[in-house]
């Protein structure tokens, strides 16, 4: 269902997010919401940094249900993660 490259990068994003201090995660949640809104086609509720990775997983799964999924999704996830360095 989820292409291997997307699943790998999503796992990396989630692991990196779990390593971020709460204040840094709170500062970066906006970027996650921007990507989710792009994938979902509408803004999603802000449930805070503790839940945003669960939201991202669901949105990525739903986006990949369409044949082939969004182009360059793995690269978008990598860019998001690398922006937290």
Label each region the model flagged.
Residues 54-85:
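Amphipathic alpha-helical binding modules
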Residues 2, 41, 45, 69-73:
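Generic structural signal for short, flexible, solvent-exposed coil/loop and linker residues
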Residues 1-37, 74, 80-81:
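Short terminal alpha-helical segments
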Residues 43-59:
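Short, charged early-sequence alpha-helical segments and their helix-coil boundaries
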Residues 22-29, 45-49, 66, 70:
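Alpha-helical rod/repeat scaffolding segments in eukaryotic adaptors/tethers
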């Amino acid at each position: 269902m989820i292409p291997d490259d997307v699943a790998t990068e999503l796992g990396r994003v989630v692991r990196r997010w779990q390593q971020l201090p709460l204040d840094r995660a709170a500062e970066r949640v906006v970027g996650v919401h921007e990507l989710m809104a792009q994938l979902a086609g509408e803004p999603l509720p802000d449930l805070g940094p503790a839940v945003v990775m669960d939201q991202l997983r669901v949105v990525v799964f739903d986006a990949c249900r369409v044949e082939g999924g969004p182009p360059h999704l793995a690269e978008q996830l990598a860019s998001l993660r690398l922006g937290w360095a």
